[in-house]
């Protein structure tokens, strides 16, 4: 077990038991398994309150006292997930890793995620111990087994990691940092095709300290985080491995917090992953993982395990977790620093937004108009042709097709499509045919007409559009419905919610950079209105107006600085605090603004995921986002989707829709990740 560095604070959740008596513990375990049935409570209580070193002593004493193998007895007495968890705790860490890897490459198929997790996250010392343990336990060479079971660049990088030769000195050469940034840039972004060997050499061998500086410089030089380049240049398991290496270089604890969250979210629990991480990190960095988990996911690791597991299995995992954490939203001092640094980085990043639908290269509006007319003439409709044409043309090209269709046939293409198509496919195709501002105007009109208002649609559109987009929507709304958007919002909403929407609908957000002094003042207003400031400098209603004005009119770069100052000032995250302190539509619109400022593609990825998860699909939201973002940032949304939900947007759509609607959505989605 790797020990903390000299003077470093111990961050594990399991410690040496103070009055340790291995002989007595061996006897307790023997009695717990004697006779009919076993005392699982006694077993889990004892094993989770001893360190791994102490458990090895218990194993030896058990063999001396009873001539039996303790692990074999535990395997015989226990079953299922509980047995895997307890037996995992009883193995020395290197042997536990060796067993996981053996299982990952045995039988049909390979568990690449397990290989990636272990080899990307372990230190040199842990890798050397793992290689020796594998040889000892299975009388086989680990490198030979892995090379026999994997291929390509993925295999090459695994072999590099298996050497355990990452540099470990903290002295960093600025010249070498610059050279590595240049080499990575030339190997990927500047090259036709990718020089994977450079990525493998630099990411597989340089020290963590050195690589953190390389990543910072790469962002400053290229305007892209290294992760974005890896996603753009690499693919498959090799891409996943390199992203895992980067995450572990940045923060191993954050990498494991993400893995744990993904293991428990959604339907079904990935128990193997959950067990492996809880066992392997319990004496290393479980406290750090817990801090980051709460910061990122607004809930404690403890509460998620509690809600997602049951029985003795749950009790054992909770013991390894080591305790529940305070209310969501508040940062530990260390986590506040991480969040602060994240905002510093995001201020430098120039994320390149990319849509998935681009203008067709060999565009011929005349041929397209004729093909569409043919697809709708006579009996039946050729939906495939309609989808192939409309989903693969830009919006500007579709407007040309509409015009050409009218010139050729004296008919309105929209009216023909409306009469020939139906249901979800009709809504999707007609949406694609409308100019973006008119489409948004229609969605806002639909959200306000009839009984009840679709507040979610109003929020989604008004909280995320740019000034130019909002002004175009206002013009389109007036043109199409002979009424101003502001009047429509006024008559359909009320109170603070109405004021916020009308403010957003003016399209009057500042477009400059940040002002640090003003950002501190704005953060103070936010702290006062959210009732976590020590002092208050005004009455509640004027503070509410100022808070609304800050969120609705300040520029995105400035608001990022405000959120950063808010963390610095309060140790809270503004989004979590709004969720906790506010309610109803006002809370929802403020949260949407904050999320959009933080990461707009991620905001839409979350909305798409929610539109398809659980029973039933929210086709309206799914259609609206796919249509409205297809030429703006749908490629970025796809990347955020797979990063957060561990499955591609393509897979989610495929699993949740069908028929021609599915085909059209996948065409807009633009590919599998």
From Swiss-Prot:
Keyword Repeat belongs to the record: yes
Domain of life, source organism: Eukaryota
Modified residues (Phosphotyrosine): 30, 201
Residue numbers bearing the N6-acetyllysine modification: 63, 68, 75, 81, 306, 370, 418, 483, 620
GO aspect biological process, one term: calcium ion import
Main location: cytoplasm
Annotated keywords: Acetylation, Annexin, Calcium, Calcium/phospholipid-binding, Cytoplasm, Phosphoprotein, Repeat
Location(s) in or outside the cell: Cytoplasm; Melanosome
The Annexin repeat ranges on this chain: 20-91, 92-163, 175-247, 251-322, 363-434, 435-506, 521-595, 599-670
SMART domains registered for this protein in UniProt: ANX
GO cellular component annotations of the record: chromaffin granule membrane; cytoplasm; focal adhesion; melanosome; membrane; mitochondrial crista; nucleus; perinuclear region of cytoplasm
TM segment ranges: none
InterPro entries in UniProt: Annexin, Annexin_repeat, Annexin_repeat_CS, Annexin_sf, ANX6
Note: Seems to bind one calcium ion with high affinity.
Function of the molecule: May associate with CD21. May regulate the release of Ca(2+) from intracellular stores.
Protein name per UniProt: Annexin A6
Native species: Bos taurus
Gene coding for it: ANXA6
